Amino acid sequence: LLLTTEHTWGLDEKTHFIEPELWDPKDFHCESARKFASSWRERRKFLKNAVLTLPNDKAAEAIRALNRLRPAEDLYLKRNVTHDLVFENKFFRIELNPSNATADTIYMKANRFRFKNSGLFTCEMFDRDDYERFRWQYLRLPEEWWAIHDFTKPDMPADAEKKRYEGFETNVHLTEWGHGKRITLVTNEHPLFRRIEIDYILPDEEDWLEIRLKWFGKVAHRLPHAAWFSLLPQKSKCSYRFRKLDEWIDPTDVVSRGGRTLHAIQDMVIDERVLVENLDSPLVAPGRMSLLDFTNKIPDMKGGVHFNLYNNIWGTNFPMWFGDNMTYRFRIRAFNQW
């Protein structure tokens, strides 16, 4: 398992994939692209190999746990809801907005905490201007060949456009079972995905709300892009604590040049009252989405928090295109454990 965290995660792009013309997904079937991508598959096999080293009973247990995380399309959604889009149990009340696939309100009854306009799914595409700004903000050697290739996209097409896809029209489906309900927002119309499902899971007797975002048929772009999931408290001035390596830090109290715009975290506490568990997406941007804007400003937390679900903005040894189906889980519950 330790091999999966090695810094050189696959072949180095600037050495093994010098292909300035190959940016369209249909081009990735050529020999050089297949060789390049094979190094990522090799690294992903480390997880499978780790499972195979376990005793049979433990291996079977691990396989079952991993399979539960595998995204599956819910093709049997039956009850379509078009009005009265307020759902609740004794712990939460949520009001959904199918016009942009968000929750207008997530209200926690135990502590009267409220989120607004939350659960927003955003995709953004970057252009050359983004990288030029970032190069001079971030690189200590901004004119070195290796640094330019590692941290920017010098060969990206000049006509690559900066775009943002924010929210989307959905259908709403309700599924009820003996001990709770699941409300699902669904679209098959997103320009970068064949299908997106966002589940709001409300068990009757559990004090948490789980939001589960699943995507299917993602376009495997080489062009730089990112996907985000956002939460925004209604209260404009909230305190935040991020848990990193089991230490709690304040995102507004980070040393100058200490990486104020992005954090890898285990979970977070908002306003000393709410625990947010980001079970599958450790990278979070406080205040605003920020990948290629290496500002040294203290983040304005009025903008909420934004979890990065995917990006391919760096060069070096990481997957430069990715089309897998994915699941991301977020749990929200009251917090009183200091």
Segment roles from a protein language model:
Residues 113, 205-247, 337-338:
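Acidic (Asp/Glu-rich), glycine- and aromatic
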